[in-house]
Amino acid sequence: MERASVGTLLISVAFLAMLACSIALVSGLFGTLHPAFDSFSHFRVHLAVLMALCALPLLATTFRLQAAVALHFAVAAFATTSGSLSFSRLWPVQAAYEAKNEDRAIYKLLQMNLRYDNPTPKKVLSLIGRTNPDVITLDEVSAMWATALGYISSAYPYRILCPYPNGIFGVALLSRRPFAAGTEARCERRGAMATATVDFGGIEVDVAAIHLSWPWPREQYWQIGELTEPLSALGETAIMAGDCNAAPWSAAVRRVAALGGLTVMPSAGPTWIHIKLPDFLRRFAGLPIDQVFSKGGVTIHSATRLEDTGSDHLPVMVEFSLRLNQQKPLDEHETATAAISQTGKTPG
């Protein structure tokens, strides 16, 4: 009798959990109606998996019909994220990135949320030195980081740091390549976005770093509205990266992309999890909230999550090329990270 009561209780708990997950999933699909709904969308993958796990044992109970419907819904909800996550590359028809063109230079952008109180800044500086990116977009640039980044000023002399009012969530943009002549790097008034026009050997590209606040009930929705002007001011060819605190399929990220006339890059995978949890769990069950956007002549070729550097976010390395009519002029001082495939003999 007691065993039957326990079984009934477990079935009831599983059914209620399945129902709660379904309500949250449905709410997340209506993120454009209100930011409160969009807050559920960031957990769509987790909710879909949890609902499926709750539904499976219910298939052997009187709730089998409801469980079957829930399983189908979980699969459908999960499928809505497949075009945004890296596992979509398992299917050739959904290949996420374009193949490299041997006639174009390949550049590297490193996106990092540094974490304002990172106890291991040397790991960050070491990673930058080893990977040698052309441009770097940084989030959570606190006063501590403003000092630490000074150690690589000779390697990255072109830079702009934009402080946030709380002194913690600022952004920064560092470049090995010069900012375009006659242009000026600029900060959004509250330090949530930094923009500079970078000269890639004669081709000018707007590069931006962005850091959004947390979703509703925090200020993310209103903050995106405040960023309308700098986003819409991005040039015809641009690349932007940052911690959006939002999943790539969310209404928030789609809104950012629409304001800037940008395309969201398929995610490299989960990049964030609570700082106390292990790295292997972050790579498997974290949230994919570090995004890269592009438009115009920028072609994205790859995106890779790098090793842990003491932050609650993983760094993301992006390889891209410029798809313009005029290829950049030959330059004997071409940066080491721009790999140009040459045929014939080298200049003498």
Feature roles, as predicted:
Residues M1-G7:
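Short, Lys/Arg-rich, polar N-terminal cytosolic tail immediately upstream
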Residues L10-M18, Q66, A70-F73:
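Small-residue packing motifs within transmembrane alpha-helices
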Residues I11-L59:
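Membrane-embedded alpha-helical segments of integral membrane proteins
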Residues V45-L47, L65, L212:
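Hydrophobic alpha-helical segments, especially transmembrane helices
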Residues L109, R115-R130, V135-G348:
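Soluble catalytic domains of enzymes that build or remodel membrane lipids, polysaccharides, and related
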